[in-house]
Amino acid sequence: MECAVYDTYVTKKDGRVMHFDVIVEPSTPHEKAIEYGKEYLKDSGQDGQTMTQEECQFCHVQEAPKVVEDSIQQNGYFIQKMEGCP
C-alpha cells in the first residue's frame, strides 16, 4: 500500500517544536491530514496549537510498512513521531 507523508512542525505550549509526520492514504485530502494532526495534538496535551497547511506540508508518497498500513486501515492515519513528541 502506498501512503502520503505530511511533514509537520508545530510549536508546543512551552515554545519548543514538535516534529512528526501525518501519514495517510494518497487520496486523503490535505485538510483531512491536518484534522488527523490536530487530533494527535489534542491526545498529546497540545490542543489549540496552530496547525495549518503551513505547519503540515505534503512531503512525498512511499510504500507503507505493515504497522503503518494497519493503522491507516483502522484509524485513517498513522503518526510517525520524530522530535519533541511525547
Where are these regions (language model features)?
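Short, flexible N-terminal segments of the mature chain
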Residues: 18-43
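Short, charged/polar N-terminal "headpieces" of proteins
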Residues: 1-18
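Generic structural hydrophobic/aromatic packing signal, biased to beta-strands
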Residues: 6-8, 22, 37, 79
